[in-house]
Regions:
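Short, T/G/N/S-enriched strand-turn elements that build extracellular solenoid repeat scaffolds
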Residues: 6-13, 62, 119, 142
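C-terminal functional modules
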Residues: 179-189
């Protein structure tokens, strides 16, 4: 497949697009505070088998444009979104209204501190794996963003990794709850 290094990739304004087997690697040479890939408006897009890493803000974000035009009917599937760089290290910010759907299906969010993803609006988050999400949220609906959300969250796996300060705690009914725990400093040796 094709690999794009060093700068942000934008799909803004596209319609009726299918993008497959693309690797996007922004890295530290990319613009500070920018996403590795994103959409600010557009419709009817499918992203399949992408690998998007090393973003300096988020790895892949979907938002309104500056004129308030919404992205509509977007699917990201069978993709890897991970290893956000620097202190921000986020998987993605996905924001629409409650009529413009975004589907995230069978993706791997890995090694991002938070926003794996952070969503607002109409969202389906189905059969994804979130691994090693650090000190932030594994999945965040709404958060401090204003606006309504209608979200379907089904059959996802949240796997604690080596930098997480979360642990699985078995409940009385044998269900598993993931709880945040204070981290102690790691000994140097």
């Amino acid at each position: 497949g094709v690999v794009l290094y060093g700068n942000r990739v934008s799909f803004t304004g596209a319609s009726n697009l299918i993008c497959r087997h693309l690797r996007i690697r922004m890295g530290t040479n990319g613009p500070d505070g920018k996403d590795a890939a994103g959409i600010a408006n557009g419709e009817n897009m499918i992203f399949d088998h992408l690998s998007v890493t090393w973003g300096r803000d988020e790895n892949f974000s979907i938002n309104w444009d500056s004129k308030g035009k919404l992205p509509r009917n977007i699917t990201i599937q069978n993709s890897i979104l991970g290893q956000g760089l620097q202190n921000h290290s986020c998987g993605g910010l996905i924001q629409t209204d409650t009529e413009s759907g975004i589907t995230l299906f069978r993706n791997l969010y890995t090694d991002n501190k938070t926003r794996n993803p952070k969503v607002k609006g109409l969202n389906q988050f189905v059969n994804n794996v979130v691994y090693n999400w650090g000190s932030g949220a594994a999945y965040n609906m709404g958060g401090d963003s204003s606006g309504q959300s209608e979200t379907t969250i089904e059959d996802n796996y949240f796997i604690v990794g080596p930098v997480d300060n979360w642990q699985n705690v078995r409940q009385e009914d044998n269900s598993i709850k993931v709880e945040k725990v204070p981290m102690s400093p790691t000994p140097p040796f």
